[in-house]
A protein has these predicted regions:
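A ubiquitous, low-specificity "background" feature that marks scattered single residues
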Residues: 16, 26-28, 89, 115-117, ...
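The conserved acidic donor/metal-binding loop of glycosyltransferases
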Residues: 20-24
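Hydrophobic helical membrane-anchoring modules
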Residues: 6, 76-79, 101-179
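Acceptor/aglycone-binding surface of glycosyltransferases and processive sugar-polymer synthases
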Residues: 1-11, 15-17, 27-106, 133-152
Length: 179
């Protein structure tokens, strides 16, 4: 994923749409992310499966883990987050620069949200339609949900101990000092 952010920068992209390869994100729904970015410019727009009239339903253990993760992430980021594992994003160029320098490898969505907020970037969520998974398997399965949750919570806790990296901060990048 980080290589994609770096390539987008090298190509001069002002924005990048990121979506998971499991078929859950209908590409046509990207219009909603773009409309949100035009209406209220921000650094990241996340397509959330938990919007008004959502028909998304995961198994009970997944729903419980994601609700707990969303609550914890919302608290540490001081921003309401409903879908901490969504891989459907519209990323602005300044945030691309940050992610080209720093991007988490283990639990990228939740850790990236914590990272971008720590570095001073802003984000919004927009409800989008999600389809059932078309390919692959979720990394969050019923038996492994507790293990997944424990690892993500630990990663987020450790992330809170890190200081802001000036090279990847919103203030530094938006003043035109970043590569």
């Amino acid at each position: 994923v980080q290589a994609g952010f770096q390539d987008a920068l090298e190509c001069g992209a002002e924005y990048l749409i990121r979506l998971d390869g499991d078929g859950q994100h209908p590409p046509a729904e990207a219009r909603k992310l773009i409309a949100a970015m035009r209406t209220q410019p921000t650094d990241l727009v996340i397509g959330t499966r938990y919007g008004v009239n959502s028909t998304y339903h995961g198994n009970w253990s997944r729903q419980l883990a994601l609700k707990a993760l969303a609550t914890f992430l919302s608290a540490i980021c001081k921003k309401r987050i409903t879908d901490p594992t969504s891989g459907f994003w519209l990323v602005s160029r300044p945030l691309l620069k940050c992610f080209a320098i720093h991007y988490p490898a283990d639990y990228p969505e939740a850790e990236a949200i914590a990272l971008l907020r720590r570095q001073g970037f802003e984000m919004e969520e927009v409800p989008v339609a999600f389809r059932p998974r078309q390919a692959g398997r979720s990394s969050i399965r019923a038996w492994g949900t507790l293990n997944f949750a424990a690892k993500v919570f630990l990663a987020l806790f450790v992330d809170r101990l890190r200081s802001v990296d000036p090279r990847g901060s919103a203030a530094f990048i938006k003043k035109g000092r970043a590569p």
